[in-house]
């Protein structure tokens, strides 16, 4: 396995570990999710370019579209929670309340 694949997989694992460690803050979770999506984008692009798969050139672009949608929804949720409660702690929120 080339070293760049190892670096990308290590970046994904680090972002996933960050999601597990910093799951009490919404902003930290969103940043770690963005890191995971970026490493998945780089990994899928490298695999497609190394395998010369001309059929699936659209897959990394589709992944970026979903990452942008996830970021927009996450930031909207962060703004809503910050305006409503004044903090971004996930453990203090109860989404079952009206």
From Swiss-Prot:
Keywords: Electron transport, Membrane, Mitochondrion, Mitochondrion inner membrane, NAD, Respiratory chain, Translocase, Transmembrane, Transmembrane helix, Transport, Ubiquinone. InterPro entries: NADH_UbQ_OxRdtase_chain4L/K (IPR001133), NUOK/Mnh_C1-like (IPR039428). It catalyses: a ubiquinone + NADH + 5 H(+)(in) = a ubiquinol + NAD(+) + 4 H(+)(out). The keyword Protein transport does not apply. The chain crosses the membrane at residues 2-22, 29-49, 61-81. GO terms for molecular function: NADH dehydrogenase (ubiquinone) activity. It is a multi-pass membrane protein. GO terms for biological process: ATP synthesis coupled electron transport. It is an enzyme of class 7 (translocase). Pfam families: Oxidored_q2. Its EC number is 7.1.1.2. It comes from the Eukaryota. It is found in: Mitochondrion inner membrane. One of its GO terms (cellular component) is respiratory chain complex I. Belongs to the complex I subunit 4L family. Core subunit of the mitochondrial membrane respiratory chain NADH dehydrogenase (Complex I) which catalyzes electron transfer from NADH through the respiratory chain, using ubiquinone as an electron acceptor. Part of the enzyme membrane arm which is embedded in the lipid bilayer and involved in proton translocation. Core subunit of respiratory chain NADH dehydrogenase (Complex I) which is composed of 45 different subunits. This is NADH-ubiquinone oxidoreductase chain 4L. It comes from Avahi occidentalis (Western woolly lemur). The gene is MT-ND4L.
């Amino acid at each position: 396995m080339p070293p760049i694949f190892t670096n990308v997989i290590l970046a994904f694992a680090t972002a996933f570990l960050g999601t597990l460690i910093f799951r009490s803050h919404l902003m930290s979770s969103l940043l770690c999710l963005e890191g995971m999506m970026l490493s998945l984008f780089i990994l899928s692009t490298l695999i497609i370019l190394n395998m010369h798969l001309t059929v699936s050139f659209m897959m990394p672009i589709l992944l970026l579209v979903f990452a942008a949608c996830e970021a927009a929804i996450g930031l909207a949720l962060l703004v809503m929670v910050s305006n409503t409660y004044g903090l971004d702690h996930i453990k203090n929120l109860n989404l079952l309340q009206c």
